[in-house]
């Protein structure tokens, strides 16, 4: 059945799954939408209460479009919507993001195999989108790109992507305010930032994540090769390799994205800085 106005209520758990026109799951039953504009978008899009679209008894393959027919632009905008809903539910009612994150990680892995140039181009160009969400997506895309170039297995890459999508859970509530902030940070803000890797790990454990690689990657993604990072001031090869990849992806994404108090850096300038200006902090073999 097509989703129409009146079927979804604001701040009430969804009574059904919502599927896109291609049959893929967009939102899971039980998710709460807190913004009316999001409901309006769902009603404007071609979305359904069953994976088979209008006909509950029709085979999905007979009516869905192929995933390859979806442009990268459409996919990024759709993914931004899904991530925003997921993280909003997490901040508002403690929604467990793990299932959504792991599914999106696999999607991103395949997108980065099938159309890496378009994906990379989009996350460079769309820095106008909601800061906390596009930065999270940038971290995942750049991490997958790096891991693929290192020849990592699919399982290892998707696990890394999951870490990239959750590394900032511990400061997610602050990210939009920090984006708009100019001038020195207050002491409590600095303390929260320095604690966020450990806070993120605690949150993931609370949501049932037991994978040590995922947790280690998140917990040490702000360590630096020269020992200047946090929280444990680890150095060199003592830093988990996944964390070293996340550190580079995060630094690169942060620097190409605009902030209230500075303009975005060009990709060339950022890479030059990573290779020269900050070469002691980041694993140069990975850079």
Feature locations, PLM:
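Alpha-helical scaffolding flanking metal-ion-dependent phosphate/phosphodiester catalytic sites
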Residues: 139, 162-173, 191-202, 206-287
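Short N-terminal micro-motifs specific to bacterial/archaeal maturation
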Residues: 29-30, 130, 184, 191, ...
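Acidic/His-rich, divalent-metal-binding segments that scaffold phosphate/diphosphate chemistry
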Residues: 59-194, 199-213
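Short, contiguous strand/loop micro-motifs
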Residues: 24-26, 130, 187, 229
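Short clusters of hydrophobic/aromatic residues that line enzyme substrate/ligand-binding pockets
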Residues: 18, 33, 179, 185, ...
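Helix-turn-helix-type domain boundary/helix-start signal
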Residues: 31-32, 150, 183, 208, ...
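Terminal helices and disordered tails flanking the catalytic cores of nucleotide-processing hydrolases
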Residues: 1-92, 96-99, 103, 264-287
């Amino acid at each position: 059945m097509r989703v129409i106005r009146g079927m979804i209520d604001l701040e009430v758990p969804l009574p059904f799954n919502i599927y896109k026109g291609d049959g893929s799951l967009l939102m899971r039953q039980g998710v709460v939408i807190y913004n009316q504009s999001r409901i309006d978008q769902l009603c404007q899009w071609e979305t359904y209460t069953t994976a088979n679209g209008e006909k509950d008894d029709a085979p999905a393959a007979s009516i869905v479009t192929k995933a390859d027919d979806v442009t990268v632009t459409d996919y990024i905008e759709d993914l931004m919507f899904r991530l925003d809903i997921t993280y909003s539910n997490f901040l508002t009612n403690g929604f467990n993001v793990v299932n959504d994150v792991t599914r999106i990680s696999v999607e991103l892995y395949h997108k980065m195999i099938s159309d890496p140039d378009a994906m990379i181009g989009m996350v460079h160009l769309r820095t106008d989108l909601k800061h906390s969400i596009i930065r999270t997506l940038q971290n995942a895309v750049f991490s997958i790109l790096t891991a693929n170039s290192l020849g990592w297995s699919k399982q290892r890459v998707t696990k890394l992507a999951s870490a990239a999508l959750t590394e900032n859970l511990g400061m997610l509530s602050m990210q939009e305010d920090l984006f708009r902030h100019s001038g020195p940070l207050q002491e409590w803000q600095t303390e929260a930032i320095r604690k966020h890797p450990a806070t993120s790990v605690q949150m993931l454990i609370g949501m049932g994540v037991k994978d040590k690689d995922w947790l280690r990657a998140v917990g040490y993604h702000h360590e630096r090769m020269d020992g200047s990072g946090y929280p444990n001031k680890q150095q060199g090869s003592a830093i988990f390799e996944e964390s070293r990849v996340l550190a580079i992806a995060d630094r690169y994404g942060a620097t190409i994205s605009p902030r209230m108090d500075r303009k975005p850096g060009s990709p060339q300038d950022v890479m030059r800085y990573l290779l020269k200006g900050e070469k002691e902090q980041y694993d140069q073999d990975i850079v």
